[in-house]
């Protein structure tokens, strides 16, 4: 079982990002038929908190010291509140294509921050993997965009989306050790609880003003998918991956999201597959493989110790 941990971690990250890729079109449709971005963020955070607390009733209890509870507030701020609020508000200001392109910056931030905070080396293979993945993701986004977009990008929205990526990259680097210390359910339970406490005072009146009877059933089903699969299940899967893999490896799976979005659009007949998209898929897969195969700090230290022992 121990030998299968890396494989399980990679599969969990793939499916988490696949759900996020599916969440994008469903969430966007919901936010144009009865609810707003602020409502969606509130539903995700509060819904996640309720689901994780219910799940915790059926899992072993874990004692979390006060110091770590305070640290989890920081994790909630960077991993949930700032990330989700900045991206959702940014998306409402700028164009979807601009927002999608900006999200490709997250693995770059994660690689740089992991080098500064965790002292993870930026190897040639790792840097090349991030470049390949970023290039492939941008090609996917640009080639799948509509020829004529009714919405023009806005620098304010772009900067907010950029801030969301930086926030999540900081979360991956700053709280990597804390996340590994406790179970996935315990960490998420407290993170979503703190996020709810921080967000709800500012969004409650907005959500209370929804005309619930006028919201279509399809919108509630889409919102349900976003809350359950795009939030609850995805955060469980992502943290399983975090328990085993390095922050840069976790972040590189961000490039799977546009891949899934384009695949779904082609399968449903909304989009048309193009040869350039085939190249983009190859680049994304190659990028993920290169980053996964790059040497970690521990690998390099082991090699150095082995050389010293041989000398």
Descriptions of predicted regions:
Residues 1-43, 150-177, 197, 201, ...:
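Glycine-/small-residue-enriched transmembrane alpha-helix faces in small-molecule transporters
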Residues 5-10, 34-38, 42, 64-70, ...:
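Juxtamembrane helix-entry segments on the extracytoplasmic side of multipass membrane proteins
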Residues 11, 42-43, 84, 98-105, ...:
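Helix-helix packing/entry segments at the starts of transmembrane helices
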Residues 32-82, 109, 167-174, 189-208, ...:
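Transmembrane alpha-helices of multi-pass small-molecule transport proteins
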Residues 47-51, 102-116, 131, 194-199, ...:
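Alpha-helical transmembrane segments of compact multi-pass small-molecule transporters, enriched
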Residues 52, 73, 113, 125-144, ...:
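Hydrophobic transmembrane alpha-helices of multi-pass small-molecule transport proteins
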